[in-house]
Amino acid sequence: MRFCALLFLSVGLCSAAVSTIHVPNGGIQPQVIEKDGIVHLLYFSGAAEKGELFYVRSRDYGATFSTPLAINTPGSAMAIGNIRGAQLAVGRNGRVHVAWNGAAPVGRIPMLYTRLSDAGTAFEPERNLIHDAWGLDGGGSLAADGDGNVYVFWHAPIPGEKGEQNRRVWIARSTDDGKVFEPERLAFDKPIGACGCCGMKAFADASGIHVLFRSADQLVNRDIWLLSSSNHGRTFEGAQVAHWNVGACVMSSEDIAATPNGLLAAWESEKQTYFGRVEAGRIVKPVAAPGEPKNRKYPVVAANAKGETLFAWTEGTAWKKGGSVEWQVFDKNGHPAAQRGTAPGFPVWSLVAAFAKPNGDFVLVW
């Protein structure tokens, strides 16, 4: 439903509408990218400890989806903990790339990667990208650009070390659309650790590569950091985004999304969710989700061509417990618009995803 006065209809000042769709085939943990009129969607299905990943696409912005393509070897992916699942990127010539935490014993969990075949009809057999930096726990991430570069990130201890303080962010890079990856190396060597069971989010575009992750300095400084590279991942600069003094693993996730005016980033801190604009390797003008927070988690952000922003998050989720999904539209000046919504019945272990249509309306997927 649109909430706009008749006075404004003729001049196009009606705010964007928000619709919701459920993940196809009862899946969970959707990851969505809309590019060139195609909505790319992956999801998880099966037992949370050992399940399957599937990919579908839509050419009518979620009204219908294609027949699912299997992504992984059955049982080689996990959904448990919400933040260890698959992530999605679309690179040169629309090729789809996927990376996820493998389902394996702690200490030898692989960072798995696959891509859509040249024919576009199936996914290649998955590959483990870890050579030396074992110790995967919280979810990794990936990004791809239009020049054929693919970047996969994860955090793990320095080889031979243990503990969150000794965790670092690692990068494996491909320059040929994911055909071959270089061995992993440190992306950022500042000794601030990484929150062991927390996720990451990576994004690449013409401005460079950006990565959000949570530190674990002295085990209680679990701050959000933004890493940025302008040289195709050879080096990264880091900036602290938000401080959180907590001596526990908070199992958080982040999001980064492109807009007509640059990038937006979203994160969680002290049981509240925020988003802000990425500028010169920093995040500026953070905005909190409105209202009284009730254990808000798993934020996502999307923006349309009019400069409006959809911000969504979950409320009340916990270990083995679902909750609700909440959302708020913000106008081009960053002020809350009339579109505020909530939906109960958010599934256990799931996530929410969002994208904008060409007409400016938004779609939430959960």
Where are these regions (language model features)?
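Bacterial N-terminal signal peptides
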Residues: 4-12
